[in-house]
Amino acid sequence: MKKIVFTGGGTVGHVTLNLLLMPKFIEDGWEVHYIGDKRGIEHQEILKSGLDVTFHSIATGKLRRYFSWQNMLDVFKVGWGIVQSLFIMLRLRPQTLFSKGGFVSVPPVIAARVSGVPVFIHESDLSMGLANKIAYKFATKMYSTFEQASSLSKVEHVGAVTKVSDQKNPEPDELVDIQTHFNPKLPTVLFVGGSAGARVFNQLVTDHKKELTERYNIINLTGDSSLNELSQNLFRVDYVTDLYQPLMELADIVVTRGGANTIFELLAIAKLHVIVPLGREASRGDQIENAAYFVKKGYAEDLQESDLTLDSLEEKLSHLLSHKEDYQAKMKASKELKSLADFYQLLKKDLS
C-alpha cells in the first residue's frame, strides 16, 4: 500500500488544505500519516475529522526572526524533532511528504529530504513564511497561491484551493431557526476571525451590539462559547462546521482577517468583504500584504485594526453595498482559483 505523510500546524490555516486532501488519498487506497504536535491545533482538527489517519507527535520549537533566549532551547527542540521525524520516515518509508507549513513542519521536511522522500509544499501567502523559506531549500516542489519571484525555480503558481463547495446542500435546521430571528429587510454582516483573530471583532460587537443590530443582521463567529447567543438580529457562536458555508451564503458582507484561506473562499463565492488584517505586532505582516493585494485587484476593502471603529466599519460596509456589482464582477472574473479536484489530480501527477 502506498503511504503519504502530511505535516503542517500551529494555526487552522496550516491544516485546512491537508484536511481536504487526506480524504482523497484515503479514498484512493493510500495509507495516510500525519506528523505534528499532539498539543497543537493540527491534532485537534484531525481528531475532530474522524479520518483514518495515524498521528505522530514530535517536539517542536518556534522559529523567531528576532533575538530571544528561548531560541537557544528551541534549537534543541527542533533538532530533536528532526531526529524523531527521521525515525518515522525510515520506519514508514512513505512515497512522499506534503507540507502546509508552520513551525512544526520544518523537522519532517528536513527528515524527508535526508531519507530520500520527495517533499511537496504549499504556500498560501503573498510572502513566504519563515518555515516555508527553510522548507523550500529541501523541497522537490512548492505550490503557491500567489505568483512568486521567477528566481524560485521550484515554485508552481496554482492559485487558491478553497474549501467552499459549489454544491448546494439542504439548509440545516439550525439555519432556519437563525433566519427567523433576522430581519429580511436588513443587510446581514458576518464577522469571522479565526482562533485568536476574532477577539477584536467580538469586542466590537459586544460594545456596539445595540447600534449594529438596529442596522444589520449580525453573525459573529467568536471562538468563545461564553458569548454564544441567538436573539433579534444577532447570532453569536464559537465554532461551526456544517453551518460554515450556509452562513457565508446568508451574509451580504463578511468582515474577516487577512488569512489567505478565508479571503480566497470569499473570492470563490464572489462575496463582498472587508479585510481587517492582523498587524505587524501580531504577525509577520503577511495579512497586510494579502489585504493590499485584494484591494488592488478590486476584490475587497481593507481597514487596519488600529483604525477599526463602528463609524469606520460602517463607511466600508456602505461603500461595498453601494458598489456591489463592481466588486462582484471583478471577483467573478478572477482566474486565481483552483478546484480541490483539479489540485488533487495535479498533485497525484507530480507524485507519479
Swiss-Prot record:
Example of a GO biological process term: cell wall organization
E.C. no: 2.4.1.227
Top EC class, one word: transferase
Topology class, membrane: Peripheral membrane protein
GO MF, any single term: undecaprenyldiphospho-muramoylpentapeptide beta-N-acetylglucosaminyltransferase activity
Pathway: Cell wall biogenesis; peptidoglycan biosynthesis
Entry keyword Cell membrane: yes
Location relative to the cell: Cell membrane
Chain residues that bind UDP-N-acetyl-alpha-D-glucosamine: 195, 287
Predominant cellular place of this UniProt entry's protein: membrane
UniProt similarity note: Belongs to the glycosyltransferase 28 family. MurG subfamily.
Function comment: Cell wall formation. Catalyzes the transfer of a GlcNAc subunit on undecaprenyl-pyrophosphoryl-MurNAc-pentapeptide (lipid intermediate I) to form undecaprenyl-pyrophosphoryl-MurNAc-(pentapeptide)GlcNAc (lipid intermediate II).
Protein name as catalogued: UDP-N-acetylglucosamine--N-acetylmuramyl-(pentapeptide) pyrophosphoryl-undecaprenol N-acetylglucosamine transferase
Native source organism of the sequence: Streptococcus pneumoniae (strain CGSP14)
Primary gene name: murG
